[in-house]
């Protein structure tokens, strides 16, 4: 009888340990405030509760701002080979002084916890080199106003996937963005809609996040503006929600639990 009780307790502890070993995350920001953000560079929050990434003084040259959610997000649990899926929705407005000569754009990014701003300009405050740099541990979805396209960048400003999107035509208009990551398929998908013009843009790529970013990341935004008055633009994020969850990735969680149970039995 005692042996049976011990076995039941052992089973419970194994299942409890693995049920709680990964950390799901969820938040919804309808109005930004400085208490739930890590602000870097020129980034600030307006009195209306909007996230202002660049040009806080108005048409500021060579401006750069980054803002990340204050709590780290777990992407990978190596103890059970479990990778998180996630989805994020946000709205933004980019306003260029001269739509024929604007720079550089805005990005949603996963960066290392404690990351500091990188180079300005086309590097968007996220990278220090043009070439692939595995040590960057950064994956970004870039809304590139120079090339008028959406990019998926993995540890480099050289994109692994692009799709044209006319930011100039929609200058100053609100954009609605949804990004999803399906961990079993390593599938990263981006959808953008401008309600005012009904223009839609889509891009996707295969990104094995467990190889490209650290297990815990900071999620948020980065933007840079041009180095001359005629190339300046503002980048404002109006709302943001994010949700991540761990699923039974390729059956490995169950396999590991079974191994542990077999050892007990």
Curated annotation (Swiss-Prot):
**Function of the protein:** Seed storage. This carbohydrate-binding lectin has toxic effects on an important bean bruchid pest, Z.subfasciatus. Antibiosis properties of legume lectins are proposed to be due to the lysis of epithelial cells of the intestine by binding to the carbohydrate moieties of these proteins.
Query: Could you describe the subunit structure of this protein?
Result: Homodimer.
Alphabetical list of PROSITE patterns matching this protein: LECTIN_LEGUME_ALPHA, LECTIN_LEGUME_BETA
What Gene Ontology molecular function terms does this protein carry?
carbohydrate binding; nutrient reservoir activity; toxin activity
Instruction: State the family named in the UniProt similarity comment for this chain.
Output: Belongs to the leguminous lectin family.
**In its UniProt record, which GO terms are filed under biological process?**
defense response
Intrachain disulfide bonds: 165-201
**Disulfide bond as a keyword?**
yes
Q: Which residues constitute the signal peptide according to the record?
A: 1-21
Q: Which UniProt keywords apply?
A: Disulfide bond, Glycoprotein, Lectin, Plant defense, Seed storage protein, Signal, Storage protein, Toxin
The record lists the lineage as: Eukaryota, Viridiplantae, Streptophyta, Embryophyta, Tracheophyta
Q: Which domain of life is it from?
A: Eukaryota
Glycosylated residues are 33, 89, 128
Instruction: Name any one Pfam family assigned in the record.
Output: Lectin_legB
Write down what this protein is called: Arcelin-1
CDD domains found in the cross-reference section: lectin_legume_LecRK_Arcelin_ConA (cd06899)
């Amino acid at each position: 009888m005692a042996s049976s009780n011990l076995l039941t307790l052992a089973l419970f502890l194994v299942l409890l340990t693995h049920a709680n070993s990964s950390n799901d995350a969820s938040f919804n920001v309808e109005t930004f405030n400085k208490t739930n953000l890590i602000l870097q560079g020129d980034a600030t929050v307006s009195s209306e509760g909007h996230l202002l990434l660049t040009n806080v003084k108005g048409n500021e040259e060579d401006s750069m701002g980054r803002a990340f959610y204050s709590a780290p997000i777990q992407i990978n649990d190596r103890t059970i080979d479990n990778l998180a899926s996630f989805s994020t929705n946000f709205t933004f407005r980019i306003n260029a002084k001269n739509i024929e000569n604007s720079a550089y754009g805005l990005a949603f990014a996963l960066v290392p916890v404690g990351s500091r701003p990188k180079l300005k300009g086309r590097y968007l405050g996220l990278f220090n080199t043009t070439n692939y740099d595995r040590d960057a541990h950064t994956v970004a979805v870039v809304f590139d106003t120079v090339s008028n396209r959406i990019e998926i960048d993995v540890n480099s400003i050289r994109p692994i996937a692009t799709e044209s999107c006319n930011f100039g035509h929609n200058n100053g208009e609100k954009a609605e963005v949804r990004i999803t990551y399906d961990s079993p398929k390593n599938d990263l998908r981006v959808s953008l809609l401008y309600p005012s013009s009904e223009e839609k843009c889509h891009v996707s790529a295969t990104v094995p996040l467990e190889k490209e970013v650290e297990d815990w990341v900071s999620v948020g935004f980065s933007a840079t503006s041009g180095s001359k008055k005629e190339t300046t633009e503002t980048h404002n994020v109006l709302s943001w929600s994010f949700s991540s969850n761990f699923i039974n990735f390729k059956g490995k969680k169950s396999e590991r639990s079974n191994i542990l149970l077999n050892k007990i039995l």
